[in-house]
């Protein structure tokens, strides 16, 4: 695929082919407070700022996702509000009316986060609203998303510190205590189970924020045990929001989803790729899934 920064400049003899995707990018929040605990590999667990629901809600309300698409993806993408936007197991009522800084400020104040004139940050007791927003230093798109989103959040008195690190360093030190710019997106709802079930807390890159909600676990377990796809999708959707709780923005707000990338390809003008589907996260090459439909249209 062509990187977003280059997707506007396709060679004259070629054509641009755009494949929609659920290849998302978002901010995973550490959900537990810092109580000095460590993962099996010694990585510290918890963050006293992101463990506060009001902080997570405020970040979600501050993000102008259309601007993130324009700036970080050069316009080749769409806003993201969940891990599987538009797929049958996604809860469509999760779209956030954002940016809404007035609402975000109200939530922060009600939760006890008061702005200090000295540095402009909010504090809850002695705790400043400051945390690292870590991304793999080799990924320019995630770097831009981190930097732009940090500026969007700053007027709230929240300081997200964009920090580029190697994946090895992220795993050793940051995975469970920093907010992380991650990418997911799958053709299978099983990914939702890995991302949000408490039994996968601290399991690799999936539920690295140690998210745990008993009601969400019950919905996810019911989805896997369902007798048919329709029944399963109802439970997958309920895990995101069931009217009372969920992992999504109406509930625990465990992520701040940002964008879904468009997969852009440059092909010969004579090549017809047929009806393209929806691409998952970037690993693999799903544009070839309909290879038998490809046609050469020139003599």
Where does each model-flagged region fall?
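Ligand/substrate-recognition segments at binding pockets and active sites
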Residues: 1, 88, 113-186, 263
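A ligand-binding cleft/hinge motif common to bilobed small-molecule-binding domains
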Residues: 2-11, 186-191
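Aromatic- and glycine-enriched glycan-recognition loops and surfaces
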Residues: 4, 51-53, 99-100
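Aromatic-rich, solvent-exposed beta-strand/loop patch
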Residues: 8-26, 117, 127-128
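Detector for C-terminal structural segments
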Residues: 17-25, 60-96, 100-105, 141-151, ...
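A bilobed periplasmic-binding-protein/Venus flytrap-type ligand-binding module shared by bacterial periplasmic
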Residues: 23-55, 71, 260-262
């Amino acid at each position: 695929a062509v990187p977003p920064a280059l997707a506007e400049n396709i060679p004259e003899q070629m054509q641009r082919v755009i494949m929609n995707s659920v290849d998302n990018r978002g901010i995973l929040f550490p959900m537990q407070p810092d109580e000095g605990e460590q993962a099996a590999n010694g990585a510290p667990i918890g963050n006293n700022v992101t463990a506060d629901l009001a902080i997570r809600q405020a970040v979600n309300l501050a993000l102008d996702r259309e601007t993130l698409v324009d700036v970080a993806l050069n316009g080749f993408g769409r806003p993201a509000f969940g891990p599987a936007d538009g797929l049958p197991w996604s809860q469509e009522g999760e779209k956030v009316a954002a940016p809404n800084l007035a609402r975000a400020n109200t939530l922060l104040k009600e939760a006890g986060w008061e702005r200090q004139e000295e540095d402009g940050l909010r504090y809850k007791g002695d705790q400043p609203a400051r945390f690292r927003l870590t991304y793999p230093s080799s990924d320019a798109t995630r770097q831009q998303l981190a930097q732009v989103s940090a500026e969007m959040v700053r007027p709230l008195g929240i300081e997200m510190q964009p920090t580029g690190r190697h994946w090895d360093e992220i795993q050793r030190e940051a995975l469970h205590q920093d907010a992380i710019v991650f990418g997911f997106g799958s053709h299978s709802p099983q990914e939702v189970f890995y991302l949000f079930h408490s039994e996968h807390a601290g399991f690799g890159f999936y539920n690295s924020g140690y998210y745990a909600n008993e009601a969400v676990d019950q919905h996810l377990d019911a989805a896997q045990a369902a007798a048919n796809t329709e029944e399963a999708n109802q439970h997958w959707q309920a895990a995101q929001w069931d009217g009372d709780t969920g992992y999504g923005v109406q509930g625990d707000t465990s992520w701040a989803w940002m964008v879904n990338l468009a997969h852009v390809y440059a092909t010969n003008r004579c090549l017809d790729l047929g009806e393209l589907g929806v691409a998952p996260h970037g690993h693999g090459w799903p544009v070839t899934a309909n290879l038998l439909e490809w046609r050469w249209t020139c003599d």
